[in-house]
Regions:
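Extracellular/periplasmic juxtamembrane helices and adjacent flexible linkers that interface
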Residues: 255-336
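Sec/Tat signal peptide C-region and signal peptidase I cleavage site
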Residues: 20-24
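Short beta-strand->loop
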Residues: 32-34, 126-128, 146-173, 188-191, ...
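Short helix-loop capping/hinge motifs at secondary-structure junctions, enriched
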Residues: 129-135, 154, 167-175, 254-261
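Bacterial N-terminal signal peptides
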Residues: 8-19
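Ligand-binding pocket segment of bilobal, Venus flytrap-like solute-binding proteins
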Residues: 172-239
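N-terminal segment of the mature folded domain
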Residues: 25-155, 297, 330-334
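A bilobed periplasmic-binding-protein/Venus flytrap-type ligand-binding module shared by bacterial periplasmic
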Residues: 122-130, 245-262, 279-283
Length: 336
């Protein structure tokens, strides 16, 4: 798995995985996903294909497409024939409804937990020994600290990163938005390069050796340590972070056109199964089934988490205020 992860780091951002299953497959699916779910879905796809074969006798081939969540959503809107999408945040799937009408408006109500079979959060990955003594978000705003994070215009994970830092400062200063914006501006003044997706930023930090601290998906941080060496990196858990809820959905019009609705729906539902939840936990995603929450409880650090609705009023409002053209990110980054 270590070799596979290193190879994935060097791969292109939008790559189709080799099909799973025999060449004479009865049905194929395309799962369009965000950047760091590659290893998760390699294992999950194998498990689902075996489950489906045992249940129906049919062979299912699952192909994967990965990249920054915003770019992935736009690819589906522009015609990429995804049977299902498993993206980093709800806004990008809302856009598939709003701009292409490929899914219903109420897509998020169709599966449990607002269609999020697993959750995650944002942590800080530093080099072994933590030479810059990073302890919390405020250390990222100090002069002389090089911070790696992707571009929130294209990456879903980067938007979670941005809001996690903003939310930390809001909680610290009693809700002053101007102080929060200035705090986040200082962090982005320390960012030397904005990659288009989370895996690209992992490559920048882990493989290229750029930066003192990487604002990272929790699962990506664990993967970097466990696959590339606990002697090279360590995780710093901030005092406050955001509960990230990556959602999934059937792409109705594509699935109906390709006559894959039944298997595509079963594929998503299997993410909530015992096997699906166990695979999520093994890949450092936080399961939502209480049985597997308990099983993997010792794996995950205790984090003081807030929800996007709590501080930002949900994704539609957050996107408009922070990441749309002229929003706070543009204001911050134009001053760099």
């Amino acid at each position: 798995m270590k070799h596979a992860f290193k190879s994935a780091l060097l791969a292109g951002a939008l790559a189709l995985a080799l099909p799973l299953g025999a060449s004479a497959a009865d049905v194929s699916l395309l799962n369009v996903s965000y950047d760091p779910t590659r290893e998760l879905y390699v294992d999950f796809n194998k498990a689902f294909a075996a489950h489906w074969k045992a249940k129906t006798g049919d062979t299912v081939t699952i192909k994967q497409s990965h990249g920054g969540a915003g770019k992935q959503a736009r690819a589906v809107i522009d015609g990429l024939q995804a049977d299902v999408v498993t993206l980093a945040l709800a806004y990008d799937i809302d856009e598939i409804h709003a701009k292409a009408k490929l899914i219903p408006r109420d897509w998020q109500a169709r599966l449990p937990n607002n269609s999020s079979p697993y959750t995650s959060t944002i942590v800080l990955l530093v080099r072994k020994g933590n030479p810059k003594k990073i302890k919390d978000w405020d250390d990222l705003a100090k002069p002389g600290v090089s911070v790696i994070t992707p571009n929130p215009k294209t990456s879903g994970g980067a938007r979670w990163n941005y809001l996690a830092a903003w939310g930390y400062e809001l909680k610290r200063n009693g809700g002053d938005q101007k102080k929060a914006q200035e705090f986040v501006r200082k962090i982005y003044a320390n960012v030397p390069v904005l990659d288009s997706g989370a895996r690209g930023s992992t490559t920048t930090f882990v493989e290229r050796g750029i930066g003192d601290v990487f604002i990272s998906w929790e699962n990506e941080a664990f993967l970097s340590i466990n696959e590339l060496g606990a002697d090279k990196f360590e995780i710093v858990v901030p005092s406050v972070s955001i509960l990230a809820e990556p959602p999934v959905t059937l792409v109705d019009k594509v699935a109906d056109k390709r006559k894959t609705r039944t298997v595509a729906q079963a594929y998503l539902e299997y993410l909530y199964s015992d096997e699906g939840q166990d695979i999520a936990g093994k890949h450092y995603y936080r399961p939502t089934n209480p049985k597997y929450v308990e099983k993997y409880a010792q794996q995950f650090p205790k984090v003081n988490l807030f929800k996007i609705d709590e501080l930002f009023g949900g994704w539609q409002k957050a996107q408009k205020e922070h990441f749309a053209d002229g929003g706070t990110f543009d204001q911050i980054y134009s001053k760099k």
